[in-house]
Amino acid sequence: MGWKGNRTPSNSQEGYYVGLMNACGYRTKDLEKPVIGIVNSFTDVNPGHRAFKELVGYVKEGVWAAGGTPAEFNVPAPCDGMAQGEGMHFILPSRDLIAGSIQAMASAHGFDGLVFLCSCDKIVPGMLMAAAALNKPCMFLTAGSMLPYEADEGTYVTPDLKESIGQRNIDAISEETFTRFRENICFSCGTCSMYGTANTMGVFAEVIGLCPIDSTTMLFCSSAKYKQARDVGERIVTLTKEGVRFSDVVTEASLKNGLRHVAATGGSTNAQLHICALARVMGIPMDLAAFDAIQRDVPCVAKFKPSSKFNMYDYYKAGGVGATMKAIERYLDPDARLATGGTVGEFLARFRRRVDPEIIHTADEPLYPDGCFAVLHGNLAPGGCIVKKSGVVPEMFHHRGPAVCFDSEDALRAAMTEKSVKPGDVLVIRYEGPKGGPGMREMSIPAAMLVGMGLHTSCAMVTDGRYSGATRGPCIGHVSPEAWDGGPIAAVRDGDMIEIDIDKHTIHLEVSDEELAERLGHIKRPAHPAPGVLGVYRKAVDSVNEGCTWLYGKEE
């Protein structure tokens, strides 16, 4: 049986559609081919997405060469790094907005297949959610990583710039050095060369089968990237003609493969939100407990900036994603399908790259035997919370200290700027959860400042908000229930002792149950306005444990 598209140009009922597409420069005979929507997240104001202005042309060439017709449209691509402070309220909500806008556009225009061009923190998961909701033939392509900055003192990448803010705050570096870092560390286009959320989710898209292997870790300017773009353009036409849909490639087994790989490589804690959200769109049950059970089942064999000295290009040169997949091969489902062709097992059987054992360990001699995350429970977080243990120094796996409370990230940042944080403190940042923020802001700059100020070996952070994927140190996030919903974190007072034990997976507020209940009865929420879309988000957002979806996952 021959291929049949979603639109039939020869049908007179499609005359209006054909006429309007002719107005865009398409010929009628072009519309008789597979029409491939190119979902482009190019923007001038996000280095991880700027390269798509050029790459999209190579994808289109591949589509035309394989007998398809490319049709490009664009979606927003906000940069987490730029959206600090007030702007950060909008970042996590933007994930579902991106997914919804793509679903609307692709459904309205009836594209036969889709290529998703994405790189950064909320754009990759937003596009994955859209792909799952649409269930069309699809492939993904990421832009590749940013060039490192080579200086006399060493090699620097983006997290070093964030940490230098803290260094400058205590005069550990000069204004001249800080200015040089600010103007040079972000050395080129491409995703920030660290294993933050962008690269965690980009690599996840590779392992679950939608994106060419090493698309994320290779340099954005590599000739291999342009070849990949053409290959993706050609391959999507084949998948479309063969009727291979998202659900034929990405199954529950694929999802678990991707999660295991995240845990094996020291990924971002934000992966918990995004993988649970994607699973929800796919109709697969997954919450924090299920996420933890899967990630604890695999050893952590690698970790990258800022949790180690190795950046994304080091990862690529050390063997890349194929090498880390090979290291945990026995934990992966070999029958999971790859959109590029074949299965995970077949790909790993062919894998022959040289592997650097200093960077990529074996499963028998791992960095950690049970994943890179620790999910903690206790009276401060009855619903759980999460920390990236692979980014915590061993001496901080257990910490007990007095609480210093802040009802917003802004208040914390002011205290750190004024240098009022003391060694031993447990910094409690609340009313920054999904509803309380609203938007579940990440404590990106404060966490980096903590490192830059040398306090990450003596202070801990605890929040119902979240952290940048490029965070290191004892930074516990996603505390549930959140303060806005009356969670125990709302009742913590300055000076209360908090004990954190990562090995035992516990977090305990040294206050009696009776005292805690009495305090919670007198809590008053602070004024955290929710204008426009944030008001809708506050009313609609689901639990952090299930991924903070707000446009997806509800029963209709």
Residue ranges of predicted features:
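A short, small-residue-rich loop immediately preceding and capping a beta-strand
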Residues: 106-127, 139-142
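Glycine-rich, highly charged phosphate/nucleotide-binding loops
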Residues: 91-100
